[in-house]
Amino acid sequence: MKVVLLVCLVWMMAMMELVSCECWSQADCSDGHCCAGSSFSKNCRPYGGDGEQCEPRNKYEAYSTGCPCEENLMCSVINRCQSA
């Protein structure tokens, strides 16, 4: 019984963490983050650092697999951040 309660508690904490990072648009995210994900599950994610996954910036600020790169980095053709 204690194990079941513990599992439920951990599950609830995980769900609360997921919901707290949820976003609908770029305005929902803090500086240094973008709103990225599928239509039903978008989360605020940090901009890509050197060698990390990225998506090129676009005028709609719509990103599905990753954020644009941090300043002074560019998103390469293989969707990895690299020095500009």
From Swiss-Prot:
Signal sequence, renumbered to the chain: 1-21
One cellular component (GO) term of this entry: extracellular region
Primary localization class, coarse: secreted
Entry keyword annotation includes Signal: yes
Organ and tissue specificity: Expressed by the venom gland.
Keywords carried by this UniProt record: Disulfide bond, Secreted, Signal, Toxin
Protein name: U8-theraphotoxin-Hhn1f
Disulfide bond entries: C23-C35, C29-C44, C34-C67, C54-C75, C69-C81
GO MF terms, alphabetically ordered: toxin activity
Localization terms from the record: Secreted
Organism: Cyriopagopus hainanus
InterPro entries: Prokineticin_domain
Pfam families for this protein: Prokineticin
Gene3D superfamilies: Lipase, subunit A (2.10.80.10)
Similarity remark: Belongs to the AVIT (prokineticin) family.
